[in-house]
Amino acid sequence: MIDISRQLTPSHPNWPGDAPFRVKPGARIAQGDSVNTGELCTSTHTGTHVDAPWHYSETGARLEEVELNRYVGRCRVVTVRAEGGLIPAAALAGLPKRLPPRLLLHTGQPAHWTEFPEDFAALDPALIREAARRGVRLIGTDSPSVDPLTSKTLDAHHACLETDTLILEGLNLAEVPDGEYDLVCLPLPLAEVDGAPARAILLPAGTLPEGEG
């Protein structure tokens, strides 16, 4: 099993302008309480997280309306590199004509962020459309977003909407060899939200029962 989730620490940098990640101490045994507790505050797009379609479309599905099994099943991890800030469709040129339903892109982000990586590699919408033509219905990246930091049109997000492709961002793929795996990605079961942090792991391909697509 390989954990591909980013560890959330007190200094974890969120998207500029988003609510910062923090855990406020609550009860403390050392202060005479019977338990230790904490109050969690964070953006819905902290660390490893999923984007529900409602994040980028007013008529898109909220997280609870997305079938959980779409985040579970066979995937392929591929190392890619950006050209002019975007991962081009040509990055898929050497891959099979038919791909697993889930494609995870290792763009070179480190395992841990000490500051927000503003120059991250985003995805060319043409890559998303080409991946969809090859059977991909979930695209993941180790970058904090599929679109550039300064994008206002969110072309990659809308290419995902157009092709019914789900989005998984902020993965930790630093130590993951390219190849096929079984993905288990479980977003927090939050209602009426545009996304949620998720715990994502990779298992050897074929670990999950047949039928977990």
Swiss-Prot record:
Pathway: Amino-acid degradation; L-tryptophan degradation via kynurenine pathway; L-kynurenine from L-tryptophan: step 2/2. Binds 2 zinc ions per subunit. It comes from the Bacteria. The active site is at H55. Its EC number is 3.5.1.9. One of its GO terms (biological process) is anthranilate metabolic process. SUPFAM superfamilies: Putative cyclase. Zn(2+) 2 binds at D51, H157, E169. Zn(2+) 1 binds at H45, H49, D51, E169. It catalyses: N-formyl-L-kynurenine + H2O = L-kynurenine + formate + H(+). It is an enzyme of class 3 (hydrolase). GO terms for molecular function: arylformamidase activity; formamidase activity; zinc ion binding. Its cofactor is Zn(2+). Keywords: Hydrolase, Metal-binding, Tryptophan catabolism, Zinc. InterPro entries: KFase/CYL, KFase_sf, Kynurenine_formamidase_bac. Substrate binds at W15. Transmembrane segments: none annotated. HAMAP family: KynB. Homodimer. PANTHER family: CYCLASE-LIKE PROTEIN 2, KYNURENINE FORMAMIDASE. Belongs to the Cyclase 1 superfamily. KynB family. Catalyzes the hydrolysis of N-formyl-L-kynurenine to L-kynurenine, the second step in the kynurenine pathway of tryptophan degradation. This is Kynurenine formamidase.
